[in-house]
A protein has these predicted regions:
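Metal-dependent polysaccharide deacetylase catalytic core of the NodB/CE4 family, i.e.
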Residues: 1-103
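C-terminal domain-boundary segment and adjacent tail
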Residues: 102-129
Length: 129
C-alpha cells in the first residue's frame, strides 16, 4: 500500500457465489472487510448472483477483469503466461495474476517479465478511485 497499491475484497474464504446462499456469501465478504477495510470488490471466479451484486454494489466498487493469465494452469509455463499477457492486453486491461500455491512458481518469473514488457509498450498502471 505504501508503494501505491490498492487492496480489494475477494471474500474471506474465496467462496463461489453460486454454491452458497446470498446471505452466506455476503457474510463472508463482510468478514473479509472487517480485516482489510476495502471499498473495492472482485468476486472469486468472476461470478455472483444478481441479488448479491445489487447488495455489494451499494457498499463496494465492483471490479472485474478482462485478462486472466491462466497462471494457475499446470499445463502452462511462465513463458506461456507472459505470452498470454502480450497477446491479450489492450488499453484499459485489468490483468489477473494469482498468488496461490498453483501459480506461485510461475508468478515469480512471469509477473516481473510481464510488467517489464507492459512498461516497454507504454502501458501505465493506475489505481481505482
Amino acid at each position: 500500500i505504501a508503494e501505491g497499491h490498492q487492496v480489494g475484497n475477494h471474500t474471506f474464504n474465496h467462496i463461489g457465489a453460486f454454491k452458497h446462499w446470498a446471505v452466506t456469501y455476503i457474510f463472508n465478504v463482510t468478514q473479509a472487510n472487517d480485516i482489510i477495510h476495502a471499498h473495492l470488490f472482485r468476486p472469486p471466479h468472476g461470478w455472483m448472483r444478481h441479488s448479491v451484486y445489487w447488495w455489494l454494489s451499494k457498499k463496494y466498487r465492483i471490479i472485474m477483469w478482462d485478462l486472466v493469465t491462466r497462471d494457475y494452469s499446470k499445463w502452462l509455463t511462465a513463458k506461456d503466461v507472459v505470452n498470454n499477457v502480450k497477446r491479450y492486453t489492450r488499453n484499459g486491461s485489468i490483468i489477473t495474476f494469482h498468488d496461490s500455491l498453483k501459480s506461485i512458481d510461475k508468478l515469480h518469473t512471469a509477473l516481473p517479465e510481464a510488467l517489464t514488457w507492459l512498461k516497454e509498450q507504454g502501458y501505465e498502471f493506475k489505481t481505482f478511485e
